[in-house]
Amino acid sequence: MMAGRRSWPAMATVLLALLVCLGELVDSKPQPSDEKASPDKHHRFSLSRYAKLANRLANPKLLETFLSKWIGDRGNRSVK
C-alpha cells in the first residue's frame, strides 16, 4: 500500500523537471515588430525588452538574498 505512494522529494524533482521543460518552450526574447508597425507597438516592444532586462539583472540579487536568509552563512560557523 505504501509502495504506490511517491516520496515528496521525488514529486518535487518531477515537478521541477516539468517546469524546466515547459520553460524551454517559451520564447525568452520578444520578437521585434516590423517596420510597418504602429508607434504603440514599437513602444510595447521596447518596454517589454527593458522589463525583461531589468528583471534579469535584479533576480540574481533577489535569489542570493533569499538563500542567505533561509540557509544562513554556513562559512562562518566554527567547528568544535
From Swiss-Prot:
One BP term from GO: neuropeptide signaling pathway
Calcium found in the keyword field: yes
Residues making up the signal peptide according to the UniProt record: 1-32
Gene Ontology CC annotations of this record: extracellular space
Keyword Iron: no
Keywords: Antibiotic, Antimicrobial, Calcium, Calmodulin-binding, Signal
Gene Ontology molecular function: any one: calmodulin binding
General function of this protein: Inhibits calcium transport into spermatozoa; it does not bind directly to calcium. Binds to calmodulin. Inhibits the growth of microorganisms. Seem to act as an antibiotic by permeabilizing the bacterial membrane.
Protein name stated in the entry: Caltrin
